[in-house]
Amino acid sequence: MKSTKTTNTNKKDPMGLTPSQIVNELNRFIVGQEKAKKAVAIALRNRGRRKRVEGNLRNEIVPKNILMIGSTGVGKTEIARRLAKLTNSPFYKIEATKFTEVGYVGRDVESIIRDLVEIAVNTQKTIAKTEVDINAREKAIERVLESLVGKTSSSKTREKFQEKILSGELDDTEIEISVADTAPVGGGSFEIPGMPGASMGVLNLGDMIGRAFGTTKTKTKKMLVKEAMSIILSEESEKLIDQEKIIQQAINLVENDGIVFIDEIDKIASVANSGAKNSEISREGVQKDLLPLIEGTTVNTKYGPVKTDHILFIASGAFHIAKPSDLLPELQGRLPIRVELNSLTKEDMIKILLEPETSLIKQYSALIGTEKVELEFTNSAIEKIADYATTVNLEIEDIGARRLHTILENLLEDISFRASEMQGEKISIDDKFVENQLSKILTNLDLAKFVL
């Protein structure tokens, strides 16, 4: 049997990372949950593999979507978010309950893809503007100079004022300058016939017509030089970038690299014998609407049609009441990879406080450090904080690592309030300090429910 041809792997491309390298990258920020990390690492690697497959077979290879099962605060969202950041993939998170709270059914579920495309377009536009920044800045300075000294001024005068603009000396000087008129005409938006869900604002239509004829409506305004530079820089950048190219790049990124994270999917599962028939119908309707989106369909957006066949969907839920088997069988089939995330232990809490590159202890120490106050946590303090977090999670409600945020906020409240008056001091947080600050709250569980 002949092997399928593949193209060469580009080692600099994030898609070329091996599963073990991806897991190592995730380990820098997330503690534990090896099964979930391994699942997303394989999914990402397979995405890269598909790109290197030649011929028609490439289009037949679809991503194996993932269902993450675990309590809140155990790292489900963070794993997906870090994965997207690692690969610079367009990423969009949405709660499945958003489509039931206001009775969303049918085409409204497609807003997920429209929002994802919007994110990708804005990201590509930002990158493109960075590339033309020098030219755009020069043109912006020229326009501001014309308002300040006129078109007929000498080169010496222009150079002198240009230096003042660059140094910020004229930031608070008021000028009168012509800028693009961004006031909406008529307001609102309308549906495009034959394109469900693809709405177009009146302003957008006018803008498109203006572009087609090379004209843009302008308005003369009075503003400060600093404000004018910001507005004109944006205008000149828009003129220099290729809008059509940006849109095509964004759509291509969404179609091939997009990641959609659907949280709280357990909340739209139909629980047997629940007795609430209307809500069951609503939930089942949302599930049915999600099916084509996850399986692969074409969604019409204001930027053009977008195929969802190769977008990676990661769904997650706690499944305390409902079970994964309560989801529609068709939806279960479209989420073939299931991973269960473990509840966090005391040891996990200690690692979360210390090990990640952006750990909570490092964050709080850096924040207080800006006031020239050194914050030091002893090992006994870390252990005590982790112990309290685990206890509250067990006795009140398990919110995972998020419990550490509430505990640290209460623990450091006085220090945060008085830090500006404590410059030059070094504060040591030990187990006794932790106990003094939190023991009264923890002994009163009713109070802890509201405070922690």
Curated annotation (Swiss-Prot):
HAMAP family the record matches: HslU (MF_00249)
Protein species of origin: Rickettsia bellii (strain RML369-C)
Compartment(s) where it occurs, according to its Swiss-Prot or TrEMBL record: Cytoplasm
SUPFAM superfamilies hit by this protein: P-loop containing nucleoside triphosphate hydrolases
Gene3D superfamilies reported in the protein's UniProt record: 1.10.8.60, P-loop containing nucleotide triphosphate hydrolases (3.40.50.300)
InterPro entries per the UniProt record, alphabetical: AAA+_ATPase, ATP-dep_Clp_protease_ClpX, ATPase_AAA_core, Clp_ATPase_C, HslU, P-loop_NTPase
Cited NCBIfam families: hslU, PRK05201.1
Similarity remark: Belongs to the ClpX chaperone family. HslU subfamily.
GO CC terms in record: HslUV protease complex
Protein name (record): ATP-dependent protease ATPase subunit HslU
Superkingdom of origin: Bacteria
